[in-house]
């Protein structure tokens, strides 16, 4: 029988609706060294508003290129939509602490309390709003595990837009119910790489039997957008605009901690392209950059796709088909195809340019973990905290447990905060593999990564 637990504070901390952030925070405004600009692959020069107009919505381009405006006011229609599921709770993981026997205090920001099951809705509704405001017919996008595609399909349905989703093939096959949610919201869902685009045909020819990647799906979605009048491409991670919208997570987290009188010592987030991590940590990074406070910030990525920990900081294509602008980021090479691991949302070869610059400046640090260890942590969390976590989120849980056990050894009572990005109820194939002992770890060899990095584009300067 579990020992009784004495609470020294609330389990859940909710902000009032009137405490919902009224503006997104742009961490670039506080970075003395700004992220390197996107480059036009044709000219090798920084992209302009006009370069991006055929691909992105106009207002989103302005947000993408603006390194100086600290706060962007959130439009009233978006704030009203946010109130359906925000503010989200900051939860004290008392039962996990008890199971670990750690003196650390563990908090998690839970973003899975909406139909999309994740934080992705924060940016999806914003991007759909700007597409509708521009008078577009529809949007195209990619999705890995399906959370982003689900969030976008919800948002386009809300605003009456068409939605075309290219879903990474391995996730399309592993998560059939996720695609049915998207279709319920009116989206069309195509496994990527497909035979419906030129880029998809090329990738299938070069990599027969490939299970796909986010880089492949991005290429197909961009091609589909530029070939259809009245359509634009929207992206669920990586871009500056996405991290801007996701800052609502960190702003709420900081406000809730302040309400509790708690200062975070360590902040942990999973990292694929950077949307969740960037959103969670940006207000804390801002304080750190301004010299107002110090925080230990840890990014956690899959060992099968270790962009930060084994990648190179260089200009690279954001997509496998090499149709997108070049971004300076930690990358494994745009031709790198990760193994078919179960954290589909983290299978991206690169990383946000903002987070890449912060990592290069040692403002944040990173680690990588194997998926079997990730699911061990996920199972313990489910059994103690009553939420079945998404595989992506469980990378942060794994690192949180490891750090809390270090506190057990040292006796430190650190305040650890992590991002629980979403739920894993559509990831039961992955949980089944783990429970049956059939899950294995794939870690790319140095030769695998070197082969991909050898194909990085040559960029002067």
Predicted regions and their residues:
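A glycine-rich, Thr/Ser-enriched phosphate-binding loop motif common to dinucleotide/cofactor-binding enzymes
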Residues: 115-126, 239-252, 390-395
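Alpha-helix C-terminal capping segments
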Residues: 126-136, 150-162, 183-184, 281-291, ...
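Active-site-proximal loop->helix
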Residues: 148-211, 307-317, 428-436
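Active-site/ligand-binding loops adjacent to catalytic centers
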Residues: 71-73, 203-241, 249, 260-261, ...
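A short, small-residue-rich loop immediately preceding and capping a beta-strand
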Residues: 123, 131-170, 263-277, 297, ...
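Positively charged, low-complexity intrinsically disordered leader regions
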Residues: 2-136
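Claisen-condensing/thiolase-fold acyl-transfer catalytic domains that form or cleave C-C bonds
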Residues: 271-279, 371-436
